[in-house]
């Protein structure tokens, strides 16, 4: 999420500064010169060593932070992170048979409350939405990352150390480096943890965004995340059509020899979309510091249009694709407006294969080849926003109540608000996995269940093959949609064991459910079972991005993604989702706007759970 220095009830936006109860004040945007990077090979920059235990835990300043003002409510987006051009809602689709919530929790083991909005306030000194979920598990440690803090737990949920600020962890300036989109991965091959995050800079003199941004990558020195780490970065400012581009929404994948990071490139100071970007690093090379090259793989030759939301796969227990000199598989969807599709629907997925990845071994001459196949699937489309069960939403109610607003916000400007909705994503591909020769993926889609359009999930299991002539082909082994009558299923993330047992982590929210963390298991024929609740929501989400007093436009934030991780020690799947773990009334909020369980400006939490399928 975007961040600037700020005080009082102000909060920073990448597009400018908003003050509670007033209109937007456009910040000047500085665009200094910077050397071109472009496609090809470059060197990672070392940011030095780091430890989780050594991160400071102090309050630097107070404030609210989100991404861009409305972060892409209209085509052309905004000057911020987590952009999305696709308009939510207004689409209709054929009927889908709904699943049920059966009240059981098969295979559920450890399940505990993870990081929440108050951890940002206590550790970083500000609050933001949404969390953006990172999760990786190995050697009895569970590492959770969100915007913009992290925590290491034991498998029973006990904290192994302090909550840490990710700017400290990545050796970034705490005041002028803005952070977004963390993710992480534990690699059993190297017995290392890998983490990545986007950072983009503000000018130290003015606080204005200056257009410079980079991806930071951290690698643990051992299989213990509480030990030492080494931090690298590579600049992505020039990776796109503009003089200044932002490497939005970085996601991590890995195979036998490589670590892969994908981004969506947008012009930093203008409207437009520059396409997905793919970067390849030597997995062992950055772990032992023997090979710090990063290869920017061009995508234009593999697809005529602009690929969007490209998701690299990870593989449980080193079950990598070994053919064609090592292969990393990726998936992308085609319904988003960034691809040039203005209908909001599509019947194709992009299956990608980056071969020759054995050449990412330390010191080897790199010879990577990228191929793509368009795989025909059932029609899917951009989902509508998700409504939630009626309940107390004291922040929104306070903005509408003179007595509360005067006491809490020192303002007499009352504005009416109703209970907000949740973002349901934009049909971009969610977390992907390669296991037992198959690629698993899921995306958010509009579904019609019980005669009503709702947000649901489409899931895919695809077998990639390469013909004797070297042509990549994807065959759909299984596909389907998950829908829940009167409710919504959103932000799915596949977790798969080496034997192909699959769990789909997801959110459950709607007329019957406060925002909850759930999951679905699949049988051997890839048929989904009922929805199970791992962490039941106890109240509505009630965050500042739901209310135009703070944002100047309406894009309620949720997600922006969930995460799963395979635990090689137990054979289980870990999952982390956003949910709402607290509730309080307007009366309680007026007396104490934290209610002892939330922030004045929001109430999101995360749930971390273990499932053995």
Task: Show the residue positions of the predicted features.
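Secretory targeting and sorting signals
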Residues: 2-35
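C-terminal PAP-associated
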Residues: 29, 34-613
């Amino acid at each position: 999420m975007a961040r600037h220095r700020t005080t009082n009830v102000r909060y920073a936006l990448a597009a400018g500064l908003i003050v509670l109860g007033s209109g937007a004040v456009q910040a000047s945007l500085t665009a200094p010169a910077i050397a071109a990077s472009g496609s090809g090979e470059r060197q990672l920059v070392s940011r030095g060593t780091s430890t989780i235990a050594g991160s400071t835990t102090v309050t630097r300043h107070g404030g609210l932070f989100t991404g861009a003002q409305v972060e892409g409510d209209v085509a052309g987006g905004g000057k911020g992170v987590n952009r999305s051009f696709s308009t939510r809602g207004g689409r209709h689709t054929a009927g889908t048979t709904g699943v049920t919530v059966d009240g059981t929790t098969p295979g559920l083991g450890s399940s505990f409350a993870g990081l929440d909005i108050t951890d940002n306030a206590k550790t970083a000194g500000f609050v933001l939405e949404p969390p953006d979920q990172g999760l990786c598990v190995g050697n009895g440690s569970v590492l959770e990352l969100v915007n913009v803090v992290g925590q290491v737990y034991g498998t029973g949920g006990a904290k192994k150390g302090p909550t840490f600020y990710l700017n400290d962890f990545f050796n970034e300036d705490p005041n002028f480096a803005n952070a977004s989109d963390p993710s992480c991965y534990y690699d059993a091959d190297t017995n290392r943890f890998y983490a990545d995050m986007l950072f983009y800079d503000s000018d130290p003199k003015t606080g204005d965004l200056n257009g410079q941004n980079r991806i930071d990558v951290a690698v643990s020195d051992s299989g213990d995340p509480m030990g030492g780490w080494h931090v690298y970065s590579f600049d992505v400012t020039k990776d796109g059509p503009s003089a200044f581009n932002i490497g939005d929404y970085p996601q991590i994948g890995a195979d036998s020899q490589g670590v892969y990071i994908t981004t969506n490139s947008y012009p930093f100071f203008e409207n437009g979309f520059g396409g997905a970007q793919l970067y390849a690093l030597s997995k062992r090379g950055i772990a032992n510091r023997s090979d710090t090259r990063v290869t920017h793989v061009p995508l234009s030759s593999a697809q005529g249009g602009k690929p969007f939301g490209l998701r690299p796969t990870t593989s449980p227990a080193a079950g990598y694709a070994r053919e064609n000199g090592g292969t990393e598989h990726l998936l992308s969807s085609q319904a988003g407006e960034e691809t040039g599709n203005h209908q909001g629907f599509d019947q194709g997925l992009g299956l990608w294969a980056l071969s020759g990845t054995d050449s990412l071994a330390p010191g080897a001459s790199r010879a990577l080849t990228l191929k793509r196949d368009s795989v025909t699937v059932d029609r899917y489309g951009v989902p509508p926003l998700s409504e939630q069960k009626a309940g107390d939403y004291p922040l929104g109610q306070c903005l509408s109540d003179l007595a509360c607003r005067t006491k809490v916000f020192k303002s007499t400007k009352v504005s009416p608000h109703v209970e907000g909705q949740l973002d349901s994503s934009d049909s971009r591909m969610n977390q992907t996995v390669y296991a037992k020769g198959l690629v698993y993926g899921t995306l958010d889609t509009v579904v019609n269940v019980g005669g009503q359009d709702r947000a649901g999930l489409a899931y895919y299991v695809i077998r990639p093959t390469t013909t004797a002539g070297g042509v990549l082909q994807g065959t759909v082994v299984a596909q389907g949609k998950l829908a829940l009558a009167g409710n919504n299923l959103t932000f799915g993330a596949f977790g798969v064991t080496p034997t192909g047992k699959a769990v789909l982590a997801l959110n459950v929210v709607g007329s019957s459910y406060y925002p909850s963390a759930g999951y679905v298991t699949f049988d051997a024929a890839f048929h989904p079972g009922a929805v199970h609740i791992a962490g039941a929501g106890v109240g509505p989400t009630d965050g500042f991005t739901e209310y135009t007093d703070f944002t100047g436009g309406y894009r309620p934030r949720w997600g922006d993604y969930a995460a799963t991780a395979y635990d090689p020690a137990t054979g289980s799947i870990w999952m982390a989702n956003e949910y709402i773990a607290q509730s309080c009334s307007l009366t309680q909020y007026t007396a104490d706007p934290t209610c002892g369980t939330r922030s004045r400006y929001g109430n999101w939490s995360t749930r971390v759970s273990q499932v053995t399928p």
